[in-house]
Amino acid sequence: MLKKEMNIADFDPQLFQAIQEETRRQEEHIELIASENYTSPRVMEAQGSQLTNKYAEGYPGKRYYGGCEHVDIVENLAIERAKELFGATYANVQPHSGSQANSAVYMALLQPGDTVLGMNLAHGGHLTHGSPVNFSGKLYNIVPYGIDESGKIDYDEMERLAVEHKPKMMIGGFSAYSGIVDWARMREIADKIGAYLFVDMAHVAGLIAAGVYPNPVPHAHVVTSTTHKTLAGPRGGIILSAANDEDLYKKLNSAVFPGGQGGPLMHVIAGKAVAFKEALSPEFKEYQQQVVVNAKAMANTFIERGFDVVSGGTENHLFLLDLIAKDITGKDADAALGRANITVNKNSVPNDPRSPFVTSGLRIGSPAITRRGFKEAEAVELTNWICDVLDDINNEATIERVKNQVLELCAKFPVYG
């Protein structure tokens, strides 16, 4: 018999210590990685529930195993809430990740060798949008589009490439783009050549749910997202559509199961259901509004301090800091800030002369700092500390001073109070 008082601390002290140290790191470090966030204790409660024990291959009402009457309720709650949140008529909440959601879309809509128009990874796209090291770049003929000299998506180039190459699918969405995407313009281009429009909104899903960023669901044939990042739920993926095309919906479902996955993770789907309910609240909208305010405040402060922000600012939760003019590598900047308890990620910038393992930039995002309660004043103060470190990157005294300031600020704004 399994006893409820069983715990990790007594059974596996080594693992328990690692978990405790990570918990402390999250409380004592400022998190600026744009794709990271803090999920609620309610979501973690769902993920730690006995739902983890249940296999449920198939879909609600059409399972291959018995005993699914309760997990059917859980999955249907997640589906209906996702549809309400994004104005969709179809939702699949089973993908284990955003990348698996994306691979299901490829499988549902394309054949290997088909042409796909996707955003260049070096210009802000994602691995699954056609990078040669990813399945998408290996199995499909990828035509990349990018940004213009101002740092904005070049829709004229996109249209020219679409007309020239006639892709079967166009991809919108990004992992490092700070502007507003014109989903309607992309759909016009797709319709002009008879292509599917697939949007990966993983980075801005929370902003979209709160109405502070344009919703691609009314424009795209199919939309995918992660459920963490700005949405602040458990790590996982979803697929959405408002195309009112039952044949398309069947293809998407089949591409997830049995095409790409077996049993869904019912404890994670429960966490998704909780997160979607949280995202339907007025408090969530206020949070997302503050995310954008904080990101803009940070970008503006960097510019005032003489740093180069790609595209000159941000309209969402993230931006890229171009360090070429400062002659600092992203790798060195990442490491120096890490010693000051500020977590960022090195990132390639447009026309980056350095390798992806070194880079010339940083990607900075505001979702996590906003989640722990930072407002504009704290965002500006933090940005000035970052500038202090980067302006004198080898000065360990400055790094130590900033680290102490970070620890004081973190103590005032605990992640989990």
Curated annotation (Swiss-Prot):
Positions of (6S)-5,6,7,8-tetrahydrofolate binding: L121, G125, H126, L127, S355, P356, F357
Sites bearing N6-(pyridoxal phosphate)lysine, chain numbering: K229
Molecular function as annotated in GO: glycine hydroxymethyltransferase activity; pyridoxal phosphate binding
Extent of the signal sequence: none
Function: Catalyzes the reversible interconversion of serine and glycine with tetrahydrofolate (THF) serving as the one-carbon carrier. This reaction serves as the major source of one-carbon groups required for the biosynthesis of purines, thymidylate, methionine, and other important biomolecules. Also exhibits THF-independent aldolase activity toward beta-hydroxyamino acids, producing glycine and aldehydes, via a retro-aldol mechanism.
PANTHER family noted in UniProt: SERINE HYDROXYMETHYLTRANSFERASE
Name of the protein described by the UniProt record: Serine hydroxymethyltransferase
Taxonomic source organism: Shewanella loihica (strain ATCC BAA-1088 / PV-4)
